[in-house]
Amino acid sequence: MPYSIPLLRPNPADPVPFYRLPHLIHTYSHLPTRAISHDDASMAYYSPAPIGCNLTEGFERRIEREDEEEHLDGLVESLEWLITRGRKGERKGGIITWRGMLTRLITMPYETRDPWEMTAIALDGSVYLELWDPPEEKAKRKREQSAWEKQGYMGYAYESFSTIPQEGRPGNGPEGWGGDVNTNVQWANVVRSAIGEIPLCIAGEVDCVKAEPGSPNPGLSGCMELKTNKVIQHPGHEAMFHKKLLKHWAQSWLLGIPEVVVGFRDDDGILRSQTTFDTAKIPYLVEVLNKPSWSPNRCLQSLHSVCSFLTKNVLPTDPLVTYPHIRGNRQAVKEAGELPPAVVWRLAFDPKKGCELHAVGEVGVVDGRWGGMLKEEYVRWRMGLE
């Protein structure tokens, strides 16, 4: 097994792979306790935030979720929930991951500052991909973010001012306030898609839907993303915003969300204006500039290149391929005394060097997680041992 494999950069002249329109297969909610409920309990309804609202509202009352590593738990639990009820889950031969991982892959050609690493393992015909986030990196990021804590909070406050929760607005806050921020609460969509010939199964948080409060889930066509940005005052601000639109487009395009609403605030956190963008048209807004800062074609080539790279190298190390007799064979596992180990891979990106994949080695069950990633009971179910 090769230790390290560099990823060749895609040729801009190569054909642009097609990104298949996402198909919604499941939704689930994180409740105020962070527990998962397989329904739309945390789905919120869009209601435009009042211009002039203060996005520092409720900062001292916010509830932040514990910094615990959840890996791919919500996504894989959803797949098990679907399949055990006779519904379709992922398509084999592809990648199962969070929307945030694919956002990093699709924007990679234009990332000039931040390196990252991801962990990949193969199981039951799919590559599971998540961020490799060691404790020292988490601590460093937390220190850096503490200086911008209030600015980061403004995005959550904008969501509160822009949405009506299932239980309605509290009634004791300022105009439009949807309730104090609790970052435990999230509503997520799980979709099937594909980049070229490679199947994708993606989950990601969705901010709200465009529908009458109290009405049922309208599906992907009614989903919306909410973002904040500083008021654009000069060409430098405008150039920065056009670069920011790359991430806004990628996040929404990958999950099939048709609209992005951006609230523009001043330095004091006062909302001055807001604009709705059609996700599919965002690339054209940038394309017409004299010097476009990014191209969706290069992004799609990048995504396909990395996904192809991963499936080609990681899928053959699936233990159900290398140890086919294990599937459904409880006796063999009992005699071995443990599950066959996962072959763990690390995908590393450095803006100056590019991307490479290297094999970390075989990892069994560590603290209840196979390969350090997937819960043991989920792996046993996938292997037909439950």
UniProtKB/Swiss-Prot annotation:
Homology family: Belongs to the DXO/Dom3Z family.
The organism of origin for this protein: Cryptococcus neoformans var. neoformans serotype D (strain JEC21 / ATCC MYA-565)
EC category name: hydrolase
Record carries keyword Transmembrane helix: no
GO biological processes: mRNA processing; NAD-cap decapping; nuclear-transcribed mRNA catabolic process
UniProt-annotated binding residues for substrate: R34, E205, K227, Q251
Name of the featured protein: Decapping nuclease RAI1
Family matches, as Pfam families: RAI1
Taxonomic classification: Eukaryota, Fungi, Dikarya, Basidiomycota, Agaricomycotina
Keyword Hydrolase recorded: yes
Record's cofactor remark: Divalent metal cation.
Residues annotated to bind a divalent metal cation: E159, D207, E225, L226
